[in-house]
Amino acid sequence: MSTIDLPTSSLPGSSGDPSGTEMSHSDVDVSVDIDVIFPDHTQTLSFSLLLSNTIHDVRQVILELMLAPPHTCFHLEYKREKLHSFLEIGQIPHLKLSKTRKIVLEVVLDPYTERESKYHIYTLLEFLSRKLPSSSTSPGIRAGFCIFPSLNIPSGENLQIKSSSSLEEINKIPENIVTQSLSYTNLLKKFETSPNPSNNGCFRSLALSGWNPVPAEFVIQGHLLYLTVLTIEGKTYNITSHVSGFYVNNCTSTKFDPSPCDDLQSHSLVLLLEQLSPLFKERLHLSLNDYKSGDAIAQASITGTLPQAPWITFPVPHRADLSRTQKSELFPYIENQGNLRDWNEEIQSTREMDHEDVQDRVLRERLTVKTLQDFTDMAVEGAIDMVNGNIPSLNPLEPTASQMFVHNNIFFSYGRDSVGIFSTKGGDSAAYSAVGKDILAIRLLNQFDLSNPSLLGTCVVDYAGHRVVAQTIVPGIFKQLENGSSHLIYGKVEGESDFRFDESFEGELSRISDLLHIKKHFFVDGKEKSFPLYTSMDAKALKGSDGRTYLMDLYSLFPLDAQFLEVISDEKNEEFPAYPHKLVHVRPELVQLFYEMKLQAFVNANHNAPKKKNLNDSLKSVELEGNGIKLSSEKGKNNVNKVRNDNARFDCGFNPDCFRSDYIFPPDNKELYDKDIENSYALSQYLHAEVIPNFVKSLSEPSSFLPIDGVALCRAMHRSGINIRYLGEIANIILQKSPNNVILLKLVTSEIFIRSIKHVFRNFLAVVPQVLRSHLLSHLLNNLFTVYGYVEPTKPLINENIANLFFQATQVIYSINSTSLYSSIKKEASSRFRFNLTDDLLHSLNPICILRGTCLRLGIQISCKDYFSNKSDDKICEEHAVPNGSTKFTGKKGNKKKRNLGKSQNTTNRQVESEQINIFRPKDILNLMPVIKTCIPYSGLAQESLEACKACLLQGNKELCYNLLNESLSLHEQIYGVLHTEVARAYCQLAMIYHQLEKKEEAVELARKAVIVCERFLGFDSSETSLAYMNLSLYEFSQKNEMQAVMHMQHALKLWYLVFGPDHPNTINSFTNLSLMLHGSEKFIQSQKCLQIAVDLSDKIFGKTTPTASLYLQLAQLMVLNKDSRSALHAVRVAYDILKETLGPDHQNTKEAEHWLSEFTALAVNQERQSRT
């Protein structure tokens, strides 16, 4: 029996008396077994649901279990009485449960409508396309790529089948990790899972026929659609979709005759195709069995959120498929198409939904996430079309930067200073930064349960050098109001000195200012009128025609960094170029951290609290990770309010308009303004004197976890309230205080280098058309890596006709050389990060890491090759190559063709010569993807349940913790769905808690899910994916699954080596763990080799320290097991000398090492004597 627990069924509830026959309130969350009987020979389905689930849920389970369901158009009956879709199971008429709690439902087939017919066809095509790498709607190649199922790691039933190959792999450890030949090509080639559609498909073609649409005279006879199918056997059939089902008709490619042919008909298209094609039936069942035997999450279709596409990959084989071109026609959910949806109304309606009880909150948050994600998907699609010139502008006579677009009910504009708002603050650079800060503030405010004011759905898309802002449309914004009135009710009037303030809006503004710690301050406008401000001067509120108030332009809600502003405003500073803009606001996490520190000091001073007491129980700091923001809990807010009520003297609000030349305060507020300036300086001092130095110190400690790449480093900086612009300050602190910490310095300078590259490449991309992007990027990359000793690249060979069409863009590409490129990159680094990138520093960086970081930041997908080795991977690429789609111009026939022959030969020779010299070729640039910033909030309810679970674990209440753990898991899956980045992170945390609760099997199962979802949504080589593999390895090891543990740890270390290099300090612990796992598998030689690597790394990175001595002692014991007593004696002597020097001769650890030294000395002497005799 298949047991399915839907997400909605996992909320806690009480169970009633299982023997009762009448339903009571306490029975609604009781689980019941359901048998579903079909009208044909389809096997009966059995599964379990709660009585609180609906008949619609039952229907969905049926469709999901069937995978490629033969029946999709049906209703359910109980004792021959039709059941409504939204009827709860427990409310079925005349339902009486026996002691076995089993319900038998019958499937009754319904007549088709055009929508139901399309759904039936769409479901079949969707299932058959699941394994195709191009099936995702993402703009990236192989989006959602997953390695885990292809690792062939033995588990469960296939343990014996795969154990021999796994043992052979284990015997190569650690050589296959630390080898020089380790590369992305070697890593990915055996995971290449591109099925050849012509071999694995169930038919050659299934598409809408050319006889569509159905003529009116046949519509009235019940005809819905006409289909054409080409079977694998090579036969072509024309099929009529009728209200009664599907049948083969007498149509041909030239004759229209939709009458039935023979007796080939069925209510199900699947069953009809099985009659027509034996190979279809055979391959469909093979596909079903293959899907059922594989991992469901790895194979599941991705809906609701954009998956991560790998930055390095193989091209996807392409084939003709009419159904792909007709996907929009076959899509059954017409109401979900972007051009028919009022995005603003949907988003605001979900925000205004009730959220008093748990079920209401679940529904509200689920719809909020779903609606904003649908909006984001449509915004990304529109932004790409906009940049590529496929959407007409509303104001085509304006310059490109000022043009506006409306597409699919979404407003698009460029993130540039089109009207001069930022002319005194940095122009386009300021506008670019302001857009990022604006969406950060919107996402932050979306976390609060505020129905007012309304916030626009917003998405920022960086694509091909352009920053595009996509927003929902304020109702009535394009309409002129009567009597010359304005939509503006709060904020400055554009182009004027007036300020408008509607007092009815003051309450909502006050609430927001309290949440964000913004101080109420006053502003004098051009008419010398004083107005209270609860936000920055730039923020505005508009009144829409729907009666809602919309708050926007939130890019300057947080204070400016006073110290940094002084530094960049110093015109006499000749050390660094001018900073690009003056919007140097601090992050909200820093404001929250400073607020908590001040509140702690206030509590200690006024309530006689211990000075070291922290406020984690009452306040939780703001944390922004990816798309998730973690804010103060409701309990924390209540505690803050309580403190404020106890003593109103506590004041730690900030004036975000300090240091602005256009901010004029009332004369009688001079003292208050001076206090605001003082607070801003205190915040800035706190950042530069405490937060940043402590952050560097925390990363420098041997026991700390150093981020694996720049993405992880930046997330750690944001959690600490540190802006990315302080990377240079962090690097300078390392050079001053920890010059020997080469690893940390390399990590920070790599990120400075990559981000500087991003800005330079972005400027070039913005002026180059789509057809020349691959030439530009390949040429830029070739010039970029000349710093590592590669020769100066030749100019790319651009088709003459294309070069003439885009003459200026071609000249821009030809003008690039390594000298000018590096000059621009170093200038960007000096300007943006106040740090000088020297040639010595650049030479020390890993080129693969730089290439990976550049591709991730710009959205570049490149062909999988070993670019920095002497080995040629042309053969590998040719196996997966797609024919070059560039147009070939051959010229006219006759003599001109003969004259061009020599020219063509010469061109070919120059092209071959160019490809031999250059590392990157235009065909190596496979794709350019958008980089997206969204305003989608994280689920407060799911996070609260997770925090409650952690709290129970700390208190030792394991039973309650286990219950809360299941609830948190259910809430995450209900709100986000299984396939989501936040669910991936939740899986990782929940697996760890399961492990701590000694629920080891559950921990392993959840950790496997975490690995798969991390790979599909965070990237197959992301830092979080690597850590997920390492955690899974440890959980497997605790389950005595040594072989699986070793294989997972090996894969994680390979990723670590590729992403960072061989000298990351945390690999010491990983190799130590791998050694223990190999020891448990009785692979003592391999175990010793891994521990030797850990010892060498520790010696190289940390020197002769206590941790290194501990590793030497472990190594000595392994050497003894391998009967290498001489080497063991040397290792233990090194450990003893280190401990004696660092801890002293009288320390317990030193004495223990001395004991082992004497033991190993005696052992070595005995073995020497035995060898002589």
Curated annotation (Swiss-Prot):
Record carries keyword Cytoplasm: yes
Localization per record: Cytoplasm
Composition bias, Basic residues: 890-901
Location of the Clu domain: 316-565
PROSITE patterns, sorted: CLU, TPR_REGION
Major localization listed first in the record, in broad terms: cytoplasm
Species of provenance: Schizosaccharomyces pombe (strain 972 / ATCC 24843) (Fission yeast)
Family stated for the protein in its record: Belongs to the CLU family.
Taxonomic superkingdom: Eukaryota
Subunit: May associate with the eukaryotic translation initiation factor 3 (eIF-3) complex.
Function: mRNA-binding protein involved in proper cytoplasmic distribution of mitochondria.
Protein name: Clustered mitochondria protein homolog
A GO MF term: mRNA binding
Cellular component terms (Gene Ontology): cytoplasm
InterPro entries to which the protein is assigned, alphabetical: CLU-central (IPR033646), CLU_dom (IPR025697), CLU_N (IPR028275), CLU_prot (IPR027523), GSKIP_dom_sf (IPR023231), TPR-like_helical_dom_sf (IPR011990), TPR_rpt (IPR019734)
TPR repeats: 984-1017
